[in-house]
Design a protein with these regions (language model features):
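Intrinsically disordered, low-complexity regulatory regions that flank or link repeat-based scaffolds
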Residues: 1-24
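TPR-adjacent "capping" and linker segments in tetratricopeptide-repeat scaffold/adaptor proteins
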Residues: 19-35, 66
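Short coil/turn linkers that connect adjacent helices within long alpha-helical scaffolds
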Residues: 26-27, 65-68, 105-109, 147-151
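Conserved alpha-helical positions within TPR/SEL1-like repeat arrays
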Residues: 34-45, 71-85, 112-127, 154-169
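Amphipathic alpha-helical segments of tetratricopeptide repeats
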Residues: 60-62, 100-105, 142-147
Length: 173
């Protein structure tokens, strides 16, 4: 039998509930995801891939040090695409794997965010000659996107286009 801190410690005052029900986000330092993505877009518009990589890797470490899991997921999503464009296969797959783990840890399965992770991971698979795996990931994204997005949403068009390319790679017309 083990003792938990609440078995032998007392809260600061009788009405302080944070001792028994701590706020999970109390010590989280959130990264400015919108600013990170805006700066990334600027760097990519100048085709400065090395700077974009440094930028994203810096913010990934900031998110991890600050305990910002959602920020970490956002940066990993961007890194998947950047590593893919740079031809960094191992880094791209590592980012995809970590993003999948975060989707599970944050209980985001079945969400638009989860679908976007699937889509980005699928493009990584497609880029590095794994079209069968890519098609499976695209199918996961498709089932979520079709449930939540309106028919004219551009994300659906992009998904269908990418799925078609995977089908062509597999000679499944």
């Amino acid at each position: 039998m083990s003792l938990d801190p609440e078995d032998y410690k007392e809260p600061r005052c009788p009405s302080c509930t944070d001792f028994y029900y701590p706020d999970e986000n109390a010590n989280v330092s959130f990264i400015p995801v919108d600013r990170v993505v805006d700066r990334l877009d600027t760097l990519l518009s100048h085709n400065d891939m090395p700077a974009a990589r440094r930028h994203l890797e810096y913010w990934l470490s900031e998110a991890r040090m600050g305990g910002d899991k959602r920020g970490e997921l956002a940066v990993l999503n961007e890194l998947m695409g950047l590593y893919r464009k740079m031809g960094l296969k191992d880094k791209a797959f590592e980012s995809a794997e970590k993003a999948d783990e975060l989707v599970k840890a944050l209980s985001l399965g079945g969400s638009i965010t989860a679908a976007t992770v699937c889509l980005n991971a699928a493009t990584v698979c497609e880029a590095f000659d794994r079209p069968r795996e890519a098609l499976e990931r695209y199918s996961e994204a498709k089932s979520i996107y079709e449930d939540f997005l309106p028919p004219g949403d551009s994300r659906l068009g992009g998904l269908y286009n990418n799925m078609a390319l995977a089908c062509v790679s597999l000679k499944e017309y």
